[in-house]
Amino acid sequence: MFAIFHKRIIAHLNARNLIVGLGMGALMWAAYALQTVGLAHTTAGKNAFLTGTYCILVPFASYFLSGEKLTRYNLGAALLCLAGIGLVALDSVEFNIGDAITLGGAVFFAIQMAVTAKYGRKMDINVITFWMFVGNGILSLVSSLLFETQAPLSVWTPNFICVMAFLSVGCTCVALLIQNVGLAHVPASTGSLLLSMESPSGVLFSVLLMGEALTSRLLAGFVLIFLSIILSETHFDFLRRKPRPQL
């Protein structure tokens, strides 16, 4: 990313960009760390569902951080989306320590999205996204060295390196840069709903690529999430429009 945006990054090298970008990186690190630790103590489905609760939390985070107006459409869409994610991902209703940790991660995801939406409109989003990656990378490296067992050199095969490069560049750098650019141009509540499509998209690719069964429950979840996005974007105004009188 530095190779592409180095001129802008160097030109905008100041304390404000560093503080905002590194702060966003710290929020992202906390969110992913809690999500990962929580996953070790709960099921994958519950982890995905509870992480998806950020779609409800983002409107409140944006309200407190930037005064973004809360509307009944935002809240209704968030609840509808959460119900859809529940149908797609939730496999039980028991609550344990892993669920609580995962929910903490969702809080940090919501704050990070609200911060990105607030400052992305005022600052160069590419620059602060670069510093976000730097902050997240430093904290991830330190925590990995402190708490993780380091893999032997034998695992670094050409195939493993290609997979890691795809995950690091394509699924992380490119995806999060696009996400941040989008959040800088839409309300945070709308952005969080669109990002919640990650859950049904994961299931959809599991169906297409891995042969997972597509059940009526999954279809119902997809429909609810899709309806939540339509509600947020259109308020279903097209259903209330009066037909034009014919001459």
List where the protein language model places each region.
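Glycine-/small-residue-enriched transmembrane alpha-helix faces in small-molecule transporters
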Residues: A26, L34-V37, D91-K118, I138-S140, ...
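Specific transmembrane alpha-helical segments of multi-pass solute transporters/efflux pumps
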Residues: H6-T51, I85-L87, S168-V186
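Hydrophobic transmembrane alpha-helices of multi-pass small-molecule transport proteins
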Residues: F2, L70-A89, A106-F109, S140, ...
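Transmembrane alpha-helices of multi-pass small-molecule transport proteins
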Residues: M1-A30, L57-A61, F108-V115, F130-E148, ...
